[in-house]
Amino acid sequence: MLKWALIFLVVGLVLGALGFGGIGGAFVGLAKILFFIAIALFIVFALLALFAGKKISDSI
């Protein structure tokens, strides 16, 4: 997902530099959304791994 965020960011910056500000802004906005979704998923999965690891180590 971070790969797509980076691709949309680069495309948005290129479009903005070429004068297509509206479309470029939309791509940059989409890149921001994808970036924050990826960060949120990372945090959720890190917490799940932390709590699952504690339960497994407690039961052994």
UniProtKB/Swiss-Prot annotation:
Do the record's keywords include Methyltransferase?
A: no
Query: Which superkingdom, per the lineage?
Result: Bacteria
Principal subcellular localisation of the protein: membrane
Question: Per UniProt, what is the membrane topology?
Answer: Multi-pass membrane protein
GO CC terms for this protein?
A: plasma membrane
| Iron-sulfur found in the keyword field | no
Q: Which UniProt keywords apply?
A: Cell membrane, Membrane, Transmembrane, Transmembrane helix
The record, for InterPro entries, names:
DUF1328
The listed locations are:
Cell membrane
Name a Pfam family for this protein. DUF1328
Instruction: Please give the start and end residues of each transmembrane region.
Output: 4-24, 33-53
Assigned protein family = Belongs to the UPF0391 family.
HAMAP family associated with the record: UPF0391 (MF_01361)
Q: What is this protein called?
A: UPF0391 membrane protein Swit_2334
